[in-house]
Amino acid sequence: MITAVYPGTFDPLTRGHEDLVRRAAALFDKVVVGIAHSRNKKPFFSIDERVEIAREVLGHYPNVEVRSFAGLLKDFVREQNGRVIVRGLRAVSDFEYEFQMAGMNRHLLPEVETMFMTPSDQYQFISGTIVREIAQLGGDVSKFVFPSVERWLQAKAKEYREQSWPAGKG
């Protein structure tokens, strides 16, 4: 049985992420979506919210599990008995960082391969960061995320605007 691990912050989970999970699920016996705690980033959603969102969107795939992790990816991959790390590449700009990370992971986990996947054409431009910014400014994100994710984003963005904008501006 080959287990693939697809790690990320998934803040929020987008249609592009789901596209990669769906395609990875067709290639591997099991796919573990590993949602990172991300101390270095300041996530919009808490780790529990990101896990719940991912489970709502991905729950219908029988061979996909969603788990959170903290610490080194290598430890999480070992805990999951992972043989492959799946990473998405949207553009050439993603490649340099992902290439360096794959090299480091190869040194830390020589028995595990990194597989790069490009999103389907209609999702190549989607970025969780950009989706969050659009939502925070009150824009329509329905083309980039699933309806359940959009509801989460709208509620969180409303809170953000109420806390960040002067009265009468949001």
Curated annotation (Swiss-Prot):
GO cellular component: cytoplasm
Record-marked site positions (Transition state stabilizer): H17
Residues given in the record as ATP binding sites: T9, F10, H17, G88, L89, R90, E98, Y123, Q124, F125, I126, S127, G128, T129
Subcellular location field: Cytoplasm
Reaction catalysed by this enzyme: (R)-4'-phosphopantetheine + ATP + H(+) = 3'-dephospho-CoA + diphosphate
Essential cofactor(s): Mg(2+)
Coiled-coil boundaries: none
Chief place of localization: cytoplasm
Protein name: Phosphopantetheine adenylyltransferase
Organism, as annotated: Bordetella petrii (strain ATCC BAA-461 / DSM 12804 / CCUG 43448)
Organism taxonomic ancestry: Bacteria, Pseudomonadati, Pseudomonadota, Betaproteobacteria, Burkholderiales
